[in-house]
Amino acid sequence: PANEKGRATNGAAIAMKARIVLYQNDDTKMKEIASQLKELITDPAYQYDLIPDYKVLFDDEYEWCKESVFEVNYTEIGNSNDWAGKANQGNSDIIMLGARGLKDPNNVYVEGWGFAPVTKALNDAFLPNDPRKWTTIIDHEEFRAEGGTVSSDVNQYTGYSVRKYHPRAGYSSTVGTEALNYKNNYRVIRF
């Protein structure tokens, strides 16, 4: 139900079980889980489907959309100042994944700390016109060509950073520590 977002559903349990079986690589369990996954995909009771525009999938208005099987909920209204870990109500990973020194002329993205840069190998694995590439990765040269700035003075600089979980204007807390309280949900399992 819409008022119970964040609760594990039967669909989420089936999808997680499928992940476990795949990692176990146990042929004796594959047929059973394949049957359950087929039901998950074809039974309209589950109501999962792809959204038409992949580019908006990681925007906050598409959290828990029909493509989402399971997400970890986060909120920007937590009054957390706890650096100890995942006890925060907000998503502290977001600030770490954002590009350092980023200034966006469109005021969509805000500066992060530049951790976990995207590798060139991952960037190059996408076909040039694949919409998943634009949604997943910020190419710093392309970003600069569009009038933005990004610092290259960071450890392990690659020229690429994560877009789908990049800090965005208006997504962080005005209550607790801003860096610890981004509202971006983590999409654990998508359809």
Where do the protein language model's features map onto the residues?
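C-terminal substrate/ligand-recognition segments
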Residues: 131-191
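Residues that mark the junctions of alpha-helical repeat units in TPR/alpha-solenoid scaffolds
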Residues: 3, 10, 184-188
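Substrate-binding cleft of carbohydrate-active enzyme catalytic domains
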Residues: 1, 17, 21, 191
